[in-house]
Amino acid sequence: MFYTLQLNAKLQPFDRHDLEDIIDEFLSKEDLGETSGGGTLMSKEGEIEYCDIEISLNDTANAVEKLLRKLEDIGIPKGSKLYNENFSQEIGSLEGLGLYVNGTDLPKEVYETSDINVVFDTVCEILKDILVLTSYHEGSKDTALYFYIKGNFAEAKEQIKDFITTYPLCEKSRIVQIA
């Protein structure tokens, strides 16, 4: 049976592929099936809306239930779903925080003396105990950094607030719940 795992996640293809590999290893080890590819839906602006992983499950007892349990163990974003023409189930427990760093409206010297990698690494360090997945998108007006966490979006936003309000590159940034 073929299924689609639609991830409510803004993952770059290589980040999605890492997750696909974890799922494929599990399916192979448990003799349940295999992944057979994936895809990414982009918005008009070029930002990732969501991504899919295609899964071929053997028609064995409890294959879907075992896969669903594994997906919850791995951690995938809220609002994701596993489905085919005869089945659909929403899954996911991770909340998502999108940090959109302004790339056009700050003084030139801020861009010359600040580093987006410092922002990414610092937020990862602050959230390290609850962080599960990360990705990013480089747009024409901003760079979006995506953090998927075990926990509460509002609490994660509060945890990074001091850094965001003091690091010059984060001036005029936006924080959005993405899952």
Which ranges hold each PLM region?
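Structured core of small recognition/catalytic domains
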Residues: L131-A179
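Short, intrinsically disordered low-complexity segments
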Residues: D31-E65, T134-E155
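Short amphipathic alpha-helices in soluble, non-transmembrane regions
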Residues: L19-I23, A63-I74, V119, K157-T165
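A generic structural motif
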Residues: E34-L41, S80-N86, E171-A179
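Surface-exposed, low-hydrophobicity interaction/linker segments
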Residues: L11-S36, V101-I130
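Short, hydrophobic beta-strand segments
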Residues: Y3-A9, E47-E54, E95-D105, T143-F147
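Surface-exposed beta-loop interaction hotspot
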Residues: R69-F120
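A common structural junction motif
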Residues: L27, D31, L71-G79, F163-E171
